[in-house]
């Protein structure tokens, strides 16, 4: 079965055991790509099991995909951040890591802006080069921006938490609805893989390093510690529903079909 996820340390750490057959589960063919590329691919038949931004899922993917409970990314203090070269108001041209990423959705909490889409790992350099005025950072960017001389303007996750009083759901693992019969076993395999990662944290070190954008071991360790947590074992369904409802009220998402289950 094709299994698509990102090359970021939290994913390669969490799914290493499943990909390498170290836990019971289906044999998988991994496909690693940037989260926005995964979001786009999720709308195609090629996506059998895939990581997908919650925001992208809500943009009309619910009719073809259903969410699994294990393997997602959520929590407190995990949100995207807006940074710039110096302290200023959020505005001007803002780089985002994709139109349908959860990061882009969360930026709407602050208003409507002129945005420029680029790969998440190019945003810091674009700000430093003056190509954009601000940028929304995800993944390792939370840990590297200060070292590059950038300044924090807003933590979008904190804004969400203060408004919604629940963890921030960033992404989930989804499976095609026509493969629903395989969903429970895949969900169990994901959970087993995450538990294996917790129990054997050094086992995936080489795999994680081979795919990481940021090679600093300290950054990689901090990334994993923050993003791989109890919600990776079981995504908070209430938090996901809060995000979908908020997006519908904002007019960002189409109304979800109430007859289609959100989770397996």
Where do the language-model regions lie?
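Pocket-lining segment of extracytoplasmic ligand-binding domains
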Residues: 120-209
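Beta->alpha turn/N-cap motifs
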Residues: 10, 34-36, 45-58, 119-120, ...
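Conserved C-terminal helix/tail region of periplasmic/extracytoplasmic solute-binding proteins
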Residues: 250-264
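Bilobed "Venus flytrap"/periplasmic-binding protein-like clamshell domains
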Residues: 1-20, 32, 78-133, 140, ...
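Hydrophobic/proline-rich hinge and linker segments of small-molecule sensing/allosteric domains
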Residues: 67-87, 160-178
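Alpha-to-beta junction loops
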Residues: 25, 43-52, 112-114, 128-137
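Secondary-structure end/capping motifs
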Residues: 180-246, 250
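A structural signal for short loop-to-beta-strand junctions that line the ligand-binding cleft
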Residues: 1-2, 64-73, 93
């Amino acid at each position: 079965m094709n299994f698509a996820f990102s090359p970021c340390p939290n994913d390669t750490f969490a799914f290493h055991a499943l990909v390498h057959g170290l836990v019971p589960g289906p044999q998988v063919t991994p496909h690693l790509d940037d989260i926005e590329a995964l979001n786009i691919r999720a709308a195609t038949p090629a996506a059998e099991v895939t990581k997908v931004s919650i925001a992208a899922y809500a943009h009309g993917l619910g009719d073809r995909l259903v969410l699994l409970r294990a393997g997602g990314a959520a929590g407190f203090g995990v949100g995207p951040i807006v940074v710039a070269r110096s302290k200023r108001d959020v505005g001007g041209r803002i780089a985002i890591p994709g139109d349908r990423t959860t990061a882009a959705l969360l930026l709407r909490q602050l208003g409507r802006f002129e945005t420029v889409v680029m790969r998440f790992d190019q945003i810091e350099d674009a700000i430093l080069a003056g190509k954009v005025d601000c940028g929304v950072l995800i993944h390792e960017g939370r840990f590297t921006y200060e070292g590059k001389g950038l300044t924090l303007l807003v933590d979008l996750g904190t804004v969400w938490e203060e408004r919604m009083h629940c963890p921030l759901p960033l992404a989930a693992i989804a499976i095609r609805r026509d493969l629903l019969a395989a969903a429970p076993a895949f969900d169990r395999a994901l959970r087993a893989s995450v538990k294996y990662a917790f129990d054997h944290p050094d086992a995936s070190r080489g795999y994680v390093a081979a795919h990481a954008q940021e090679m600093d071991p300290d950054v990689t360790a901090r990334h994993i510690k923050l993003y791989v947590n109890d919600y990776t074992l079981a995504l908070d369904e209430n938090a996901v529903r809060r995000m979908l409802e908020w997006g519908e009220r904002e007019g960002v998402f189409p109304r979800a079909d109430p007859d289609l289950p959100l989770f397996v």
